């Protein structure tokens, strides 16, 4: 395991307290460049743009914000910001700029706060949220996990046609009851390529939640209130629990999950997607399909957040896990591990694409600390994940062998090659002393 150091960092001002899932990266203003969204326990929603330490804009919500997200939740072809409070208030914000900006790029609101374009009450005690197509119909659904081991799915339903104004509501599609606490929600392709909704379960386990409403005789009526539980009948058969292989020391340990890990062009992988799990006691696993364990890694840190990020630019997403003390692990599909240390304790973490500088998105690691700062490490890239040395790199260069022949050095004579490289790097002004006998003139 090798250590890396990232130095390109910006510090953002943040003075509030937040829940672990009240932070995300996404394109909030539909300009193809991602922003950072953070919600705090006072109900304040802050959006950071580029490398400015101050929020680009702020919004006020009702209640303590527990989870935020960015996506086309209304299926109108435009991203909205979704903020949900512990009290069950769901807010939708359309942050596409319509007002003039000042010289620094901040909104000239003159004290006017950004207000939600839609607000609805859903069941309280929210914990985690997901915006994704979970049933394969091409439309996005909103999935919310709760502290009482319940997961609910919602879908936006229009009440009137109107592209400029949101005239509709979120209707409840289904309610699932889990055996353990839900710490993560994700979607990953199943064996047939159809999306599967997966949730984490304690003890490095996970459950697949079946979306059966498409098989029913009809869709939920628009008049059905999302807050009502009278017509929600959670069925045990719609929850398929999976215990991952291997020995688990603590069956109740908190577990996090991330799905749909991009594996590039891999004909051998078929349609099945990759997903990863991590636990608070330091276990990391990469899975393919339901019960195919690709690798398992044990570290000596408490892992509380799990993300995916392509740090090598080869189309394969690495698994990124963060511990409370700032230790961050980056692991590729071949179980190669790289670690990065942030010298502060961390209260929340996320990773993804963020337009920090140069007017383009780049891989970023985002850490929320306890000292009123958010650190964004941008341009997080590695040339390769695996460890290597100078000789291995030179061996891949055709020019290397030609130059050795000109210098009359045998490429197979490792001591002579090392001596030549040492002298070239550290004593270039001295004459070359390396002339192996195999290349000497016998006369």
UniProtKB/Swiss-Prot annotation:
It is found in: Lysosome membrane. Its main location: membrane. FG-GAP repeats lie at residues 19-48, 125-154. Pfam families: Itfg2 (PF15907). One of its GO terms (cellular component) is Golgi apparatus. GO terms for biological process: cellular response to amino acid starvation; cellular response to glucose starvation; germinal center B cell differentiation; negative regulation of TORC1 signaling. Keywords: Lysosome, Membrane, Phosphoprotein, Repeat. InterPro entries: Integrin_alpha_N, KICSTOR_ITFG2. The modification Phosphoserine is found at residues 104, 219. Part of the KICSTOR complex composed of KPTN, ITFG2, KICS2 and SZT2. SZT2 probably serves as a link between the other three proteins in the KICSTOR complex and may mediate the direct interaction with the GATOR complex via GATOR1. The KICSTOR complex interacts directly with the GATOR1 complex and most probably indirectly with the GATOR2 complex in an amino acid-independent manner. As part of the KICSTOR complex functions in the amino acid-sensing branch of the TORC1 signaling pathway. Recruits, in an amino acid-independent manner, the GATOR1 complex to the lysosomal membranes and allows its interaction with GATOR2 and the RAG GTPases. Functions upstream of the RAG GTPases and is required to negatively regulate mTORC1 signaling in absence of amino acids. In absence of the KICSTOR complex mTORC1 is constitutively localized to the lysosome and activated. The KICSTOR complex is also probably involved in the regulation of mTORC1 by glucose. This is KICSTOR complex protein ITFG2.
């Amino acid at each position: 395991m090798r250590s890396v150091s990232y130095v390109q960092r910006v510090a953002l001002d943040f003075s509030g307290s937040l829940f672990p899932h009240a932070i995300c990266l996404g394109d909030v203003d539909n300009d193809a460049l991602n922003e950072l969204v953070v919600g705090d326990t006072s109900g304040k929603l802050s959006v950071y743009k580029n490398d400015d330490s101050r929020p680009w804009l702020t919004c006020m919500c009702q209640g303590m914000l527990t989870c935020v997200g960015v996506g086309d939740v209304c299926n109108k072809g435009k991203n909205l910001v979704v903020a949900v409070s512990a009290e069950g208030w769901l807010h939708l914000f359309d942050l596409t700029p319509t007002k003039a900006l000042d010289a620094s790029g901040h909104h000239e609101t003159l004290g006017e706060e950004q207000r939600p374009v839609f607000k609805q009450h859903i069941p309280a005690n929210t914990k985690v949220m997901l915006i994704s197509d979970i049933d394969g119909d091409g439309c996005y659904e909103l999935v919310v996990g709760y502290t009482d081991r319940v997961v609910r799915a919602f879908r936006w339903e229009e009440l009137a046609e109107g592209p400029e104004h949101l005239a509709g509501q979120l209707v409840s599609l289904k309610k699932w009851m889990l055996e353990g606490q839900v710490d993560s929600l994700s979607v990953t392709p199943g064996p047939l390529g159809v999306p599967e909704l997966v949730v984490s379960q304690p003890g490095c386990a996970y459950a697949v939640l079946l979306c059966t409403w498409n098989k029913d005789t009809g869709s939920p009526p628009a008049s059905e209130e999302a807050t009502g539980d009278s017509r929600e009948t959670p069925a045990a058969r719609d929850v398929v629990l999976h215990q991952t292989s291997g020995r688990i020391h603590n069956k109740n340990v908190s577990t996090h999950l991330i799905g749909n890990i991009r594996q590039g062009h891999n004909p051998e992988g078929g349609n099945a997607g990759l997903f990863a799990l991590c636990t608070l006691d330091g276990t990391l696993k990469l899975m393919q399909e339901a019960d195919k364990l690709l690798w398992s890694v044990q570290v000596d840190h408490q892992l509380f957040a799990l993300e995916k990020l392509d740090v090598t630019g080869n189309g394969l997403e690495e698994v990124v896990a963060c511990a409370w003390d700032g230790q961050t692990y980056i692991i590729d599909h071949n179980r190669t591990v790289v670690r990065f240390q942030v010298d502060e304790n961390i209260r929340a973490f996320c990773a993804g694409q963020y337009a920090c500088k140069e007017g383009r998105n780049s891989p970023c690691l985002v850490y929320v600390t306890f000292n009123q700062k958010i650190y964004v490490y941008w341009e997080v890239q590695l040339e390769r994940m695996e460890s290597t040395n100078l000789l291995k790199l030179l061996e891949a260069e055709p020019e290397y062998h030609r130059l050795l022949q000109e210098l009359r050095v045998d490429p197979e004579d490792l001591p002579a090659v090392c001596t030549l490289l040492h002298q070239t790097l550290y004593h270039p002004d001295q004459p070359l002393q390396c002339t192996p006998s195999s290349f000497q003139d016998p006369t």
